[in-house]
From Swiss-Prot:
Effect annotated for changing residue 83 to C: Shows bidirectional racemase activity
Name listed for the protein in its UniProt record: L-aspartate/glutamate-specific racemase
Binding annotation for substrate: 10, 52, 83-85, 198-199
UniProt cross-references to NCBIfam families, sorted A to Z: asp_race, PRK10200.1
Gene: ygeA
């Protein structure tokens, strides 16, 4: 089994399911008392979020690249960045850390393609929904077209993520709002929906979505398990 290095804490609410799902995957594959060989560097999300708001992406790239190098020195054999949004600085991490980097959009793209879909809704932070680092990768590498919510919906989705989900608050009102947005995007022709923020799966259970769900945290964790046992 390879040792996986997790870059977490963005937010820590969604890092917990990563750890659980990876261990469950290892136990399911190997049985008995087997558990995952994991190294975790959990950052202070306050600092990361402030850099996001100020547009200081180079600084966040430096922070995460240094964290990845620390995991490499500690014995990690691959890196998993436990957040969608911070894949905006994936190139900064990959350029300085020589370990295999398991990109969350690649794992998600393979899952969508495997389901025979080419047109999906994308929910996430405003950075993930509006910028090209995520949607562009899905389009260029997997020919997947992403539908995003309207501007006012994107603002509210983003607000709920940062002011509720990242603080461990999961309300029925927000759950219903996300379900409403998903239903509207289904009417526009979306075949499935990407939960493109690792906290969204903590809020919206699959049965509340009218579309098949691609929960990126679960998909990414499964990708990590496959890598560890390869």
């Amino acid at each position: 089994m390879k040792t996986i290095g997790l870059l977490g804490g963005m937010s820590w609410e969604s890092t917990i399911p990563y750890y659980r799902l990876i261990n469950e995957g290892i136990k399911q594959r190997l049985g008995g008392l087997h558990s995952a060989q994991v190294l975790l560097h959990s950052v202070d999300f306050h600092e990361i979020e402030e850099c996001q708001r100020r547009g200081e992406w180079d600084k966040t790239g430096d922070i995460l690249a240094e964290a990845a190098l620390g995991l490499q020195r500690a014995g990690a054999e691959g890196i998993v960045l436990c957040t969608n949004t911070m894949h905006k600085v994936a190139d900064a991490i990959e350029s300085r850390c020589t370990l295999p980097f398991l990109h969350i959009a690649d794992a998600t793209g393979r899952a969508i393609t495997g389901a025979g879909m080419t047109r999906v809704a994308l929910l996430g932070t405003r950075y993930t929904m509006e910028q090209d680092f995520y949607r562009g990768r899905l389009t260029e590498q997997f020919s997947i077209n992403c539908l995003i919510p309207e501007a006012d919906e994107r603002a509210k989705i983003n607000q709920i993520i940062f002011e509720e989900l990242c603080l461990g608050q999961f309300t029925e009102a927000s759950r219903a709002y996300y379900a409403q947005v998903i239903a509207r995007l289904a009417e526009q022709g979306a075949q499935g929906v990407i939960f493109g923020c690792t906290e969204i799966g903590l809020l919206v259970p699959e049965e509340r979505s009218v579309l098949p769900v691609f929960d990126t945290a679960a998909i990414h964790a499964e990708d990590a398990v496959a890598f560890m046992l390869s």
